Amino acid sequence: MSTEDAAITVIGAGLAGSEAALAAARLGVRVRLHEMRPHKMTPAHRTGNFAELVCSTSLGGEGEMQAKGLLQAELRSVGGAIVGAADSSRVPAGNALAVDRDEFSARVTQAVRAHPLIEVVEGEVEAVPEGIGVIATGPLTSDALAADLARRTGSERLSFYDAAAPVIAFESINMDVAWRAGRYDQSADYINCPFTKEEYLRFFEALEQARRHTPHDWEQLEFFEGCMPIEELARRGVDTPRFGPMSPKGLDDPRTGRWPYAVAQLRQEDRAGRMWSLVGFQTGLKWGDQKVVVNLIPGLENAEIVRYGVMHRNTYLNAPEVLDATLQLRADPQKFVAGVLAGTEGYLESAATGWLAGTNAARLARGLTPLTPPPESMLGGLVRYLASANPKGFQPMNVNWALVPELPVPEGRRKLGKREKRPVLFQRGLNAFVAWAREEAGLPVTPPARPTAALATE
């Protein structure tokens, strides 16, 4: 197909859809962009503008100490529209990239509407159109389109709210306290953190006192018995958690040879074993309080939480079951999925997957092969995780350093600490992404200036 004839459809003009449309148009591909607002509003949006931020106004921490800082740098290097609009509408926020909400959305809307290759079609899309396209309809996907997606992918692969537990970096788990084992000597697929009675009561008291996130009126969360937040279980009584997800049955503590008073278990989240989630600890607690509670679990006293637990209305696919790392639907490779619907968490992550989906859709429309960024890059690490994570209980993921390969440790040398390691990971990832974008993807690249290391850490 010639460039003049190449065309794609994008559904949704949020951060992911707007970025996808502009990325494809920059490659000379015509785009038909569908957005149901303002004709049909969602409970969360105030305007009909594109890329409207409905919660926070921050796109995450900047600098080479931050995983989001690397993703920002990768997107800047290829002219990402969302991070460009954010840079132009930023407000003072320390080491974070925060924006003026209205100016940011107005800039994105202007860029989309002014582009000669983008046609904006206002109105609801009730079924995925034929041909090459990007689906980026976000957490409040309309009922009709959600039903069509469920039909295409299998209804059990489409979720309508988050119920996520905290995810811990393996290297921060104290394995002198915790141990690997399954119940009753089954395969050692879990990491177990044992409590004495005194430790459990301290943990329970902190759990009782922890502050809960207040849901938006439009979220209308209904908790199911099999997915009850840990704080809701605690409201039923001091022993409820330890007779539920924290049961010690069948787990002999190698230090004592006996079952502990209670146990917190962690399950492997990724193939490399870098990330482990707390089993049965789905929670809506405020993040600061989550950290306090998690650090009271024996073996997790210095735990690095790479993704906090959340409980909120959402619509997303079980990405490992339905998506490739190119963000193509396995059942229909002409369709790409981006943003929250693809299983990402966060504004920046939505924009980044929108950029890749739009770029790959444009490549496919031009007769080229869709690509995946290198694993050392943050975007490459994220999409590889989406395609290969444990599908059992899959929950949306934000970027973090556990998504990229560890640095090799030369023989006879010590392992680098966090503050030494992250700038090296940052530069390695950015170099790999820039080389990939220029040499493999054939894109114009402007490597951003080396950032000043931010003081804040993740």
Swiss-Prot record:
It is found in: Cytoplasm. Coiled coil: none annotated. Its cofactor is FAD. It catalyses: uridine(54) in tRNA + (6R)-5,10-methylene-5,6,7,8-tetrahydrofolate + NADH + H(+) = 5-methyluridine(54) in tRNA + (6S)-5,6,7,8-tetrahydrofolate + NAD(+); uridine(54) in tRNA + (6R)-5,10-methylene-5,6,7,8-tetrahydrofolate + NADPH + H(+) = 5-methyluridine(54) in tRNA + (6S)-5,6,7,8-tetrahydrofolate + NADP(+). Keywords: Cytoplasm, FAD, Flavoprotein, Methyltransferase, NAD, NADP, Transferase, tRNA processing. One of its GO terms (molecular function) is flavin adenine dinucleotide binding. NCBIfam families: gid_trmFO, PRK05335.1. Catalyzes the folate-dependent formation of 5-methyl-uridine at position 54 (M-5-U54) in all tRNAs. This is Methylenetetrahydrofolate--tRNA-(uracil-5-)-methyltransferase TrmFO. The gene is trmFO.
